[in-house]
From Swiss-Prot:
Keywords: Chloroplast, DNA-directed RNA polymerase, Metal-binding, Nucleotidyltransferase, Plastid, Transcription, Transferase, Zinc. In plastids the minimal PEP RNA polymerase catalytic core is composed of four subunits: alpha, beta, beta', and beta''. When a (nuclear-encoded) sigma factor is associated with the core the holoenzyme is formed, which can initiate transcription. It comes from Pelargonium hortorum (Common geranium). It catalyses: RNA(n) + a ribonucleoside 5'-triphosphate = RNA(n+1) + diphosphate. The keyword Zinc applies. Residues 895-919 are annotated as: Disordered. Zn(2+) binds at residues 221, 290, 297, 300. This is DNA-directed RNA polymerase subunit beta''. The keyword Transferase applies. Binds 1 Zn(2+) ion per subunit. It holds the Pfam family RNA_pol_Rpb1_5. One of its GO terms (cellular component) is DNA-directed RNA polymerase complex.
Amino acid sequence: MKEWPPNLAFHNKVIDGAAIKQLISRLIQRFGMLYTSHVLDQVKLLGFKQATASSISLGIDDLLTIPSKRWLVQDAQQQSFLLEKYYQYGNVHAVEKLRQSIEIWDAISAYLRQEMTPNFGMTDPLNPVHIMSFSGARGNASQVNQLIGMRGLMSDPLGQMIDLPIQSNLREGLSLTEYIISSYGARKGVVDTAIRTADAGYLTRRLVDVVQHIIVRGTDCGTTRGLSLSPQNGGVPESTQTLIGRVLAKDIYIGPRCIAVRNQDLGGGLVNRLITFKKKPIYVRTPFTCRSTSWICRFCYGRSPTSACGDLVELGEAVGIIAGQSIGEPGTQLTLRTFHTGGVFTGGTAEQVRAPFNGKIKFNEDLVHPTRTRHGQPAFLCYIDLYLTIESEDIIHSVPIPPKSFLLVQNDQYVESEQVIAEISAGTSTFAFKDRVRKHIYSDSSGEMHSNTGMYHARKFPFSNVHILPKTSHLWILLGDLCGSGPVLFSMYKDQDQMSIHSLSVQGRNTPSLSVNNDQLKHRRLSLYDKNGTGGGSIPILNYSEMTRSLSTARCNLLYPAILHENFSLLAKKRRTRFLIPFQSIQEHRRKNERILCSDISIKIPRNGLFRGNSILAYFDDPRYKIGVSGITKYGTIEVDSIVTKESFINYGGVQPKDEGKVDPLFFIPEEVHIFPETSSIMVRNNSIIGINTKITLNKRSRVGGLVRVKKIHRGIKLQIFSGDISFPRKRDKRFIPQNKDILIPPQIRKRNFNKSKKAKNWIYVQKMRPTNKNSFFLLQPVVTYEIADGINLARLFPPDLLQEIDNIQLRVGNYIRYGDGELIPGISGKNPRIQLVRTFLVLNWDQDKKDSSIEEAHASFVEVSTKGMVRDFLRIHLRKSQIAYAYMRKRNDPSGSGFPSDNELDHSNRNPFSSSYPKARVRQSLNGTIRTLLNRNKECQSLLILSSSNCFRLGPFNNVKYHNPKKESIKRDTDPLIPIRNFSGPLGTVPQIANFDVFYHLITKNRISVFHYLPPEKGKLQVIQSFLMDENGRIYKSDPYSNIFLNPFNFNWYFLQHNYHKNYPNYCEETSTIINLGQFLFETVCIAKNGPRLKSGQVFILQVGYVIIRSGKPYLAIPGATVHGHSGQIVYGGDTLVTFIYEKARSADITQGLPKVDAMFEVRSKNSISMRLKARDEYWNEYITRNLGIYWGLLIGAKLTIAQSSLSLVNEIQKVYRSQGVQIDNRHIELIVRQITSKVLISEDGMSNLFLPGELIGLLQAERTGRALEKGICYRAILVGITKASLNTQSFISEASFQQTARVLAKAALRGRIDWLKGLKENVVLGGMSPAGTGFRGLVHPSSKKYKTLSLETQRKILFDGKVRDLLFHHKRIV
């Protein structure tokens, strides 16, 4: 046997794809291309020989399922079942359920993927599937996991997750449902594949077009800048790929020895040595730092990507086109590869921290606060780095917890080994791809919607039925079957006739109460349309002060207005379902000759004339808050998130407002603001001071004098004139005025800081100004202060109620500011001479204090009544009410006669089927249950809400049930028994407020608490019974040190311990339970008694001594900010949208539809992704640095920093997308594209120059060189442009016209007289010339060298030329 050479190394390991790449690279560097190709041919033949000898084939018997899959899937199913139960109980909302479901199945799929390799290694190491999956030929671990593991969650073509997971694998076979879901992520025919391939091809075309002019035209540009790369920060493969092929920008020293010099290219051996040493950061040259504008040098680019010997790139190489094709071509291949990945969904899960052993948890409670996890579980959130200690008998272990992590255990809690104690959020990047997803929750069944908290109108939809939840609450759907009947015919009845449409008889009863006279009646329909026919106009109302009496009619439910009897006195009558507002009164013979003047009160009525609860009825514009000048509004404490900012409830009986709080004043800073078109000629300069009546344009003069600021806006120019005094700051002024902040100074503070000693009469607005190249100063502007009134007093509008009846209808009066804090009010034009700052609104509501209100909506109409020559117009609002008729359809032989349904009647099996087309007589015979009559959405039909046995259930009797036995426990009392009355928050926003005390000092709240002992009545002071909270283990919680009432916010069943202050029993406690109230909402998890029947979710419908009947309902947990499509008491149908959640969700990691992520980053237009975040970072840098360094230096440094930071961030994020799919792309290709995206700057309006226009896009290097040549700074801002916009803003209009918008580009080029110097490849190809690349580049170079070959250049001339260049670049005015 031949001996092995001693100097040849032998590597005894498996060679995979990565090792083969390294081997080929080393062979090329060591022996060259010819020898390497010979070696590779031998390797190929060896592979064919071994494959033929081994005969490896893939059969179905080789697919071995992982043994642990069965119990893992069962565990996941159990967790999903519990999660669904929590959702039905209302403990978690839909978004939390979705997140937890994703993490459950994703964790199972990841665990199976990890167990796959050890399973093959132990059971069958020579399995063909195991060998082929890691050979690098075809397939990967993810695809093998789908064969023998499970597919898990799938994503649709848009990247959204499908809720139903695929539990089977391809070896076991898929069911029909799983097969249909599985086909979503795969290729769906030729058309879909062609579309996605076309998208990838279009991306390649745009990438090539934006960099087609970048050609290697020089060896060294002379730059001294470079890119800092640290080998120890990233992984070894990433660092090696980033460094190989680069050129050093600085020398590298290891101690005193220089191992690499500047402009030396980095090979594989040198890079490995540098990574091994892990010394200081390495500075390499990059396309970002090349000083050329439209080309690149050899040293800044590095080695050629097409050269096998590792030489530097040749002159004339079209590296731009190579970069565009290198980035775009993998997109087409990845588009076709989506069939193999199958659209499997992958989402980032949180990292869990588990206890290493049994012990007790210790941590600092001051650094955490209670919260809910994204799964809806109670936890603690830590603010900063927290050290959690686990103490056992002999071991103390400390676990560091990073900020924004969740602690799932309590302090001093005993944990077991491997128990999850903390959850660390997934380390998502700042520029992680997230989508704002709207998830709609639909009703499963029909019924009534109720909410246990208040809702306010959405600002965008003031008249719609869309509401916003201010806090976490539950939405209840109380079940009920809807049975519709035929239309209600009112044509057989006359006006003012009484009829009962809620009667259960077949025929109605006609009982006229008022005779009809000969007075005229004119009824105006509510379908209001303006001149354009769009509808929804404003109806003016006359002054209410002329009216001294109001009018209403008796109780009826007609749809038409009433005719008033002549003897009917115009006094207040029953206003239970209707009321009328008089708004016009005039003699009939004067009606046609006189013109009625309208006040500022206007009514806003929806087009259909229907009002919901809390609907805005009317507006009133107070003339005190009208302004005729432009300016800025300022206020600090007034809430403007909702339309209602200050409100008071006022009944129509003349009750005065109560508990009116004081509102902070509204400040208005007058400023003259003008918006001119872009073509306007501005006759004043920016940052200049003008006087009154100064000509600012050809046909416009200023109304005030002051400082002028000119700013370019979108499609126009904004000109502001700031009136006031100017004060230059001193040192003490800088201490008095906060930096970078405008303030308001009250009149109590003297102006000694502004060179004046007299006392100010009004408020002063101080604003810091920074003009270009000048010192900063303070601008002192006068302020107009408005005190917002307390609203309209309705006592003078409506007379007192003589009958002293309680009204259902209520008005809510409030004020809201029409403009936001700091919002600029534009100039006042002739069409709109005055602007209203504060508007008073009137909100219509009814039955505010009643939980059992069944009124759904109010119908508005206008009535014109003529009595004895007097014409009166009324706005009539008719409440459409559905009365609850507790009439149960029972048989006549009911022996009990109690009026309640028996057990047989409430049984679902005894209920006969029914149809909605049955008449009322048939309904009466066939339905068993409570009938609630209500108006349908179609206002012509009636509906019956049937509360049958399927919607109600009975619990009882409770005769043999044992309640909780009282527990006695000694508690030390350290405080006085006098306990202050204090409101406290209960679970999920429920606020039980203390109402009053009875003679026994019994505490009454919304959730009534039964107590066994009362305080002795001889004490004269009111005292609250001291209560404690006991959990299921008998522990007593004390959460608030300033209150003696302790609640557990995560437990819905409240137990209280009550002190007994009797002399004989000074210190003992008793446990009590909650009493069920009529109308109370109960959850299924609540237990009211031991050994009692299990409750279902719903509302207590009937409450008796021996039993209780609960109407079934389903709770939906809603988070703050959720949109509710309806109001409390509204009838909903199955499938209706109840609530909409808005949350952020990470996109799927699988690339579909032709690289949408990469396309979004290159175009800089995607929402909630890196592009928008980079734009926000640019704006922040520009604003922050400008304030501290001034406009010129701030914009210059800010632009440099933002461009550099944005370039690096874009390169890293694009590489992440490609590396996630196993695609390796050289960083230099991406850097060339990103260089074009970040190479443009936007000329700023600050410091206008005669060379560029404000808002013009120019190159960064062009702006720098122009500023040096003119010896004057040019103000500009950094901007990110997409590849499409960058292709349309180049130096060649021929290249732009051949890309997009040909006619527009050529027309603009002709008008501007642009010159195309034909520097790029595309313009030369279009005109049929030779492209300046490759041999064409050499043809351009050689003639010039021959022409000047005979000229002798003197040394002095050369030095003089250097001096001129130095004079141009470094401001030298003389040659020395």
